[in-house]
Each structure stands twice: as structure tokens, then as C-alpha cells.
Amino acid sequence: MAAEALAAEAVASRLARQEEDIRWLWAEVHRLRDEQLNAPDRCQAEGPCLTREVAQLRAENRELRHCLYRLRLCLAEELSHQARLESAARAEAGRAAAGAQPPPSQSLEEDVKKEIDPDNEVKNPPNFMKERLKFFEILKKDHQLLLAIYEKKGDSSNVITVRVADGRTVKGEAWKTTPYQVAAEISQELAETTVVAKVNGELWDLDRPLEGDATVELLTFEDEEARAVYWHSSAHVLGEALELHYGGLLCCSPPGDGSFHYDVYLEDRAVSSAELPVLESMCQAIIKEQQPFERLEVSTKVLLDLFKYNKFKCRILKEKVATPTTTVYRCGPLVELCKGPHVRHTGTIKVIKIFKNSLAYWADNPEMEMLQRVYGVSFPDEQRMAAWEELQEEARARDHRTIGKEQELFFFHDLSPGSCFFLPRGACIYNTLIDFIREQHHQRNFTEVLSPNMYSCKLWEASGHWQHYSENMFTFDIDKDTFALKPMNCPGHCLMFAHRPRSWREMPIRLADFGVLHRNEPSGALSGLTCVRRFQQDDAHIFCTVGQLEEEIKGCLQFLQSVYSTFGFSFQLNLSTRPENFLGKIELWDEAEKQLQNSLMEFGKPWKINPGEGAFYGPKIDLEIKDALGRYHQCATIQLDFQLPIRFNLTYVSKDGDDKKNPVIIHQAILGSVERMIAILSENYGGKWPFWLSPRQVMVIPVGPTCEKYALQWLEKRKRQIML
């Protein structure tokens, strides 16, 4: 222990000296910048050198701090163990002298338990929680030391101007003034109802200090972004309860639409629906404690040490975090890898309900670990919770599976999971939708084509789908070659374009295909008509020149507006940009995204950006429709693709005679999956189909036995008229 203490002292001393060097160097940088106007040539040479030296020192200091963390942690463990031994020895000596019976032993784990849960509901907190909390406290102290350096007390440049969204300005102090303090200066009521801030366009914790002059927006629960933060913080409350109750490994808690969930890995057991009330009670206790959310930015290397007990967090750090540092949040005993932001404390969450559990897979891959998923919802008042419960009751009554059974539209069977059996009335709705969308395509000069259902894997390798999508494809071997059922039509349509030379005079070429598609969805994800393995889609592809792009995308947007106004849906548009696993050059992606943005601006409807949510071959415009219950469903998509024409070497002869010109492909699906659209329509209409879609438009009722013959004759006559 003595050696470790000496080592820690040496590291701390070196760290202090280097922090002082950093302060001096920064002072020099600021001095040079002030002199820049008077002597730009001299300062230009000195400035970069000093800033590089600062960067090198900071990088070395990060390593020193990490070493110091571990040394301090070892010392704390050793001292704590020694103190427990000495305390136990003194207590034993005292009892021996007094002749008293020894009281029940109490371990450090029980002290942690008391801090976590005053009611002592948790009998055995996970062992990793104690070490994690100690580690976090060391990180926090180091962060406070670093923050003190940035505060630069007494420096007049520390004064900042904060502009609030309503136009008023407030004076503050850099690295001290928080958005919550700004809100409280306006009114305490505003401060208490604000969920999260937006600082210079970036979501920001209310208690996170401002770093300079800023424009601050104060968002309440009425704002969509604030609701997402509110539910994300609620998920952390659920995560704390899951960790305490099960001792499992927390995985992830992505923001949901109107609710939240948390995935947890339990090696030898499962979550039971009977345990949900217990989890809800634990969440309520956590909320009552008003545990503050604390944010720290920490190096990835240190976080790998902090989360060494959790293989899932380590995977995220190694595979998803590309930056040298990232953030963690603490509330109570929970320390979680998270980008944030969060509400101020758990007491901000007034009402919570844990209502469902299910199974999931890590990364949605059935080959990976099976996880337990628990769902919850929360609100700032009882009235909103009551409205939500009423909406859920209405949603259960409108469930398309219930309507399908009651109206004899369709059913599923275990002998063909994920493939729907449409009964006569359901087939009537299905075919009416297909006929409707087919006619809409014909009116817009699309040419209908038919393409094969299965292809050699060589096609999918050429398109890139084999590398990115093969786990979702049904494959089989024929004559020593691997084939797959098609999950989409675009590669087949590329073969159609390439089967003969093409000229600019033919462009744009618009192909529409209504064939059957198959996707190997995980069995746990199958859910009625909303997620199936066999489906039909109005899958269209437009091959056009770069100069035709803007007009064609405009036509696609007008197409989807026409169709969804027929159904009576309102919608919102999302531009999904380059994902991490993208194909091709960044320059092409930037050009494609710019084209889509221009088209959306000209279309004139509200839209927003979904960063990183594009397809691997190109950016896309997704449409989300709003149903009668206020829920959003993603349906139509317009995707721009510069990659497939290059991968398939698709060319046409341009107007100036260049026969090596690559076309651009626009992927268009207006309804998307017909099966999924039937599910959405049945729930939106509550089973009360509009006349043109209804499978029972007319019913002939004879008033008596003498009229039956005439009624049958009339019915046959109408059938013949419909067929003609």
C-alpha cells in the first residue's frame, strides 16, 4: 500500500505541475491573440506552436489522470478494508470487555444499499455498483478540478451574454451560469416547468454550465424534443430499478415514440409480467428521492475500465464511439454510458407506469444474446397519464389483429410464420389497394414490369446487399450455387435497364413492380401485419439524368401527397442522411443530400433531418403518417442512389454523345408494404372501411320468401356489371 501511495503522490505532483503549465500556456495564447491586431506576422508564427504544446500536454495529462484514478481506487479499497478490520477489532474488544452479545454484522454492501434505497427493499445490490460509484466519485473530483481551471476567477472575460428565445438578454459567468439559473431569473415557474434547454441549437442539461455567449431556448414537455429527453431520463429510472432488482447487465435505452424501454441481459432468468408492479414501485421510490442527473465527459479508455463488468457497454465503446471522449450520467447508484441530455433530477418525472415486457436480441440479431426488454411511460401530471391509458384502451379495441379476426379478413398459422392468409374479404381489400396504386402509377407514366423471385447470390454481391443485408435474406443452394429470395426489386430492375443500350432520349425510365418480396425478420419481431416475412410492395425505380433529378423528386413528393390525402392522413417528412456503413464516396453523398434538401424546400411542407438514418446506398426522404390515435407510422420512402448505377456499370448515351454516362436511380415506394398499410388503415378507420375499400359495400336483404328469387337475380346482374 505504501508503494501505491508514493506512486499516487508522484503522479499527482506531476499532474499539478503540468496543469500549471497549461494555465501559463493558455495565458500566452490569449496574450498573442490580443496582440494579433498589432503584430499579425509575429503572432501567426508563435500561436500554433503554443496551442500544439497545450494539446500535447493535455493528451499526456489524460493518461496521467487515468493512472491516478486507478491508484486512488486501489488505495481507497485498501484503506476501506483496513478500516473495516480495525473497526471490527475495536467492536469485538469492546463487547468482550462489556460481556455483550455481538450485533448482526453489517457490511459495506449494506451501507451502499442504505444509500441507494432508504426503505431497504434491495437485499443484495450488485457487487459492481460499489466499485462503479467509487470510480465515478474520483472522476467527478477530477472534473471539478479541471472546471476550476476553466473558470479563471477574477477574469473580466468570464462575463457572458445569454440571449433567451423571447429576445431578452441576461448576463452570466462562463463555466458557472446554467440554463436553469437563466430560467429562474425570468421566473421560478418557468424554471420548474422547463425540461431541457437548447443552447446555440444543441440540447443542453439545465444544470450544465454555459461555456460562452449563447442563445438559450427553454423547452417544456409540450416540445417534442423535450418529451424525448423526459422519456429518456425516465428510462434511466427504469434502468436503475432493473439493475437493483435483477443485478443484470444494462444494454441500451433508445428513445421511443411516446414511451420508453430498457434492455437488460439476465443470464439465467427472465423478466415476468408479474414483476412489473414491483419494478413500478421501485421507480416511484427512485422518483421520490429526487436523485440529480450528473454529467461527466470522460476518455473512452477510462470508460472501458469503468464498464469492464459489462460486455455490452464495452462493445458500444469499441464499435460505436469514434471520439476520444464521451459522456456518462449518474442518477443515484446508476452510472450509465449516455449522450444525454437529461432532466435535472428524477423528481421531475411525476407519474410513471411500467406496462409491458418482451424479448429482444442484441443489435436486433438473433445470433446474438437474448435480452429482456421492459417498457414504461411517464408524464408530468396524472391527467396526461389518464389520457394515455384511455388511448391505449382505444388502441386495443382498434388492433388490426382483432379487426381481422372479427371481420374475417385474414389469419396467421404456425406452419408459415410471418406469412398472412388473406380470406375472401381481406383479399378484396388487398386487391383494391393494389388496383388503386397501380392506376396511380399508370397515370404518372410508370411502366409496370414483372421480375424473378429468386436470384443467385452473385447479384446481391454486386449490389452490395449481400455484405449489408444477407442475414435478412432467405437463402438456399441449387446446383452448387447459392440463391436468395428477393427482399427488394432494385437489383433486378438494374438488370432490366442494362439488358440493352440506353439513350438520353428515353430518360427518365420509370419502372413499377408489385411482385412478392421476402425478408427474414426475427421470429420475435413478427407482429400481425405490421412485421411480416412475405409481402407485396409498390416498388418503383426511376432511372434519370442528374439534370432531371429535381423535377422527378418533386413528382414523387406530389405523388405521395395525392395518395395520402385520399386516405385522409396528415404526414411529416424526414430527410435521412449518410449512415456509418455507407457505400461510395462522401462527395456523392453530399451532392445527393443537397438535391433532396432542395426538393424538400421547394415542396414547401415541414421536414426535419434524421442524421445517419439513410440506406447504405443513398440518402432518403421518409414519410410518417399520423393516424386517428395520434400515432406516427413510417410508410412511403424516396431514396436517391448514385451507387447502384456504378456497381452495375449502368450507362446511357448522353446528348453530346458520351456513352459512359451513369444514370441516377430514385427508389420510390408510396404505400410501402401493402400488408402493413392494411394494418394501419384498419386501425385508423377502426374497421369502418371507406366505401371504396369496404369488402361488403352492398348487402341485398329480401323482405320475404317471395322476393328471394328476384334478389338473387338482381345480385347476379350487379356482379356481371362489376366484372364488365
Curated annotation (Swiss-Prot):
Compartment(s) where it occurs, according to its Swiss-Prot or TrEMBL record: Cytoplasm; Nucleus
GO biological process, one term: threonyl-tRNA aminoacylation
Keywords linked to the UniProt accession: Acetylation, Aminoacyl-tRNA synthetase, ATP-binding, Coiled coil, Cytoplasm, Ligase, Nucleotide-binding, Nucleus, Phosphoprotein, Protein biosynthesis
Pfam families with a match to the protein in the record: TGS (PF02824), tRNA-synt_2b (PF00587), tRNA_SAD (PF07973)
Region ranges (Disordered): 90-112
EC number: 6.1.1.3
Coiled coil: 44-72
Phosphoserine: modified positions: S451
Class of enzymatic activity (EC top level): ligase
SMART domains on file: tRNA_SAD
Entry annotated with the keyword Plastid: no
Signal peptide feature range: none
Reaction equations catalysed: tRNA(Thr) + L-threonine + ATP = L-threonyl-tRNA(Thr) + AMP + diphosphate + H(+)
Top-level taxon in the UniProt lineage: Eukaryota
Residue numbers carrying N-acetylalanine: A2
GO cellular component, one term: mitochondrion
GO molecular function: ATP binding; threonine-tRNA ligase activity
Domain TGS: start-end pairs: 155-220
This protein's record includes keyword Transmembrane helix: no
UniProt-listed PANTHER family: THREONINE--TRNA LIGASE 2, CYTOPLASMIC, THREONINE-TRNA LIGASE
Family: Belongs to the class-II aminoacyl-tRNA synthetase family.
Subunit structure: May be a component of the multisynthetase complex (MSC), a large multi-subunit complex which contains at least eight different aminoacyl-tRNA synthetases plus three auxillary subunits AIMP1, AIMP2 and EEF1E1. Interacts with the MSC components EPRS1, AIMP1, AIMP2 and KARS1.
Role of this protein: Catalyzes the attachment of threonine to tRNA(Thr) in a two-step reaction: threonine is first activated by ATP to form Thr-AMP and then transferred to the acceptor end of tRNA(Thr). Also edits incorrectly charged tRNA(Thr) via its editing domain, at the post-transfer stage.
This protein's name: Threonine--tRNA ligase 2, cytoplasmic
Source organism (scientific name): Bos taurus (Bovine)
